[in-house]
């Protein structure tokens, strides 16, 4: 990896965030964490991550809503990591803009392989700039 990828983990469970932080950092990734949907969206706008890992069960808003709002201004890959295991829930997330879906509990080796695969599809440092456009007015986030 010629440049360190930045991964934003949005999950309300501190133990999961810690486990992912340690696992991802051991592979050379820079990890940013958020415990709520609103905090995650703000971090995404500020840090411009190369990959977003998103839990769907957040305390302040549903992860599907986070995904919809994130997709309004970013094409960065999103890996959903959730206990929601039904086919319908997976399809909804994937059709809603997620690039991949992993169900909790999960194996870390498979998770890391999926992270690598998503980062290969969207080279590090080529994350879309965060901006909102309203008619002729563009707001750089």
Predicted segments with their positions:
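Short hydrophobic/Thr-rich beta-strand motif most characteristic of the beta2 strand and flanking loop
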Residues: 28-36, 43
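Charged docking surfaces used in two-component/phosphorelay signaling
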Residues: 18-26
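Acidic catalytic/metal-coordinating carboxylates
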Residues: 36-39, 62-65, 70, 89
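The feature encodes the CheY-like receiver
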Residues: 17, 59, 86, 104
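Active-site beta3 strand of CheY-like receiver
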Residues: 47-53, 58
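Conserved phosphotransfer cores of two-component systems
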Residues: 45-47, 69-76, 96
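Short, Lys/Arg-enriched segments at the junction into DNA-binding effector domains
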Residues: 3-8, 117-141
């Amino acid at each position: 990896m010629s440049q360190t990828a930045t991964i934003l983990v949005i999950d309300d469970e501190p133990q999961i965030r810690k486990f992912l932080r340690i696992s991802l950092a051991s592979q050379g990734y820079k990890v940013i964490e958020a415990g709520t949907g609103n905090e995650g969206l703000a971090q995404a706008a500020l840090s411009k991550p190369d990959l977003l890992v998103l839990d769907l069960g957040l305390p302040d808003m549903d992860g599907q809503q986070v995904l919809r709002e994130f997709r309004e201004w970013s094409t960065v890959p999103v890996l959903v990591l959730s206990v929601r295991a039904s086919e319908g829930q997976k399809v909804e997330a994937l059709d809603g803009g997620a690039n991949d879906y992993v169900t909790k509990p999960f194996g870390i080796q498979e998770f890391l392989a999926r992270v690598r695969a998503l980062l290969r599809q969207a080279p590090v440092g080529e994350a879309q700039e965060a901006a909102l456009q309203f008619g002729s007015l563009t707001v750089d986030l």
